[in-house]
């Protein structure tokens, strides 16, 4: 694996917390907690970040922290693919981070693990993407500050589609047909990730359904979703999907190295893909899968939270306010200088020249028109349950209805825990 692939492979693309009862040795995070010694005002803060794949990200985060003069801020840059287990193990110890990045999760709030940040965000709330505000609002309070928005969609090789005489698919049926025509003895048609699970939610959204409804009840178990799973199975069974790629879907190397014609990936990879392929690349959303449905984009991203149990709670909140509310220059740098991410601050997104033209502008358009944001009630156990649906029905060829029934039991059990 190349150095670039190794960097991208460390990107742990997480969608939810594992729960605060997570176990595991904190030693895996490294013995240096940053609590002792060093210069500064006498207050030591520790922040946790997962290891981003984009070059320069670690140096940037540490540069921002070094510029803060009211406390000494130490960064724990967590490598590996189990950032969430290391983070939540650490949160149960005396060496827990004061500040950490993650995704909005209702368990964090119900357990009292994260601090209410409403007072920080309220004065600038109107300058944030309102969907981000909504996804971080639980019980009328705002619990995290969004740092970056990361839309996910399909990249495709224009030349390969042109040679096959096809247009970018607008329906799931067309994607299945395209996979057939694009597959050769050297190139596979489509890459949906080694597990195929990254497109489970987009499939649901593209039928017009959702994971949960407004009453926090199951909304994904529909005939159209079951039919869509059968179509994914067709691509898998017929050998038109790239499987067991050296690097998974968040790494753009499958398409940049010519292993596949169409790849599901994120906007963060756009500069790398364009550098490798030039103008021979386009993008499109997950295509419509049913009558009444519409194309779908996953609007992922990362947010900053404050540990409510921090010994330096006020200082931690002040640092988060300074960096992720006040320092718009750093926020823009973080979003646009290391891969492409959409700034959650509306004023920054609208003024970002790098996002105003070409493929980046198309990505922003897909984000705005077809994006689906985090649902904080959708827990890790629920995510795993739907990953099981893909495993059982797409990879193993089982009955989609039976697979969905199996998932329903887990999801309903989780919903009962959360909402009674």
Language-model regions, residue ranges each:
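Conserved N-terminal structural module of periplasmic/extracytoplasmic solute-binding proteins
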Residues: 2-107, 168, 290-292, 314-315, ...
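Conserved C-terminal helix/tail region of periplasmic/extracytoplasmic solute-binding proteins
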Residues: 3, 162, 368-420
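Extracytoplasmic/periplasmic solute-binding protein
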Residues: 32, 143-147, 152, 173-224, ...
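A structural signal for short loop-to-beta-strand junctions that line the ligand-binding cleft
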Residues: 98, 125-160, 188-189, 293-296, ...
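Hinge/lid segment of periplasmic solute-binding proteins
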Residues: 103-153, 167, 176, 282-284, ...
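C-terminal lobe and pocket-closing loops
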Residues: 105, 268-279, 289-385, 418-419
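Short, solvent-exposed loop/beta-turn-alpha elements that line the ligand-binding surface or hinge
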Residues: 118-130, 209-227, 274-276, 285-297, ...
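Glycine-centered hinge/linker elements that transmit conformational signals in sensory
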Residues: 179, 217-245
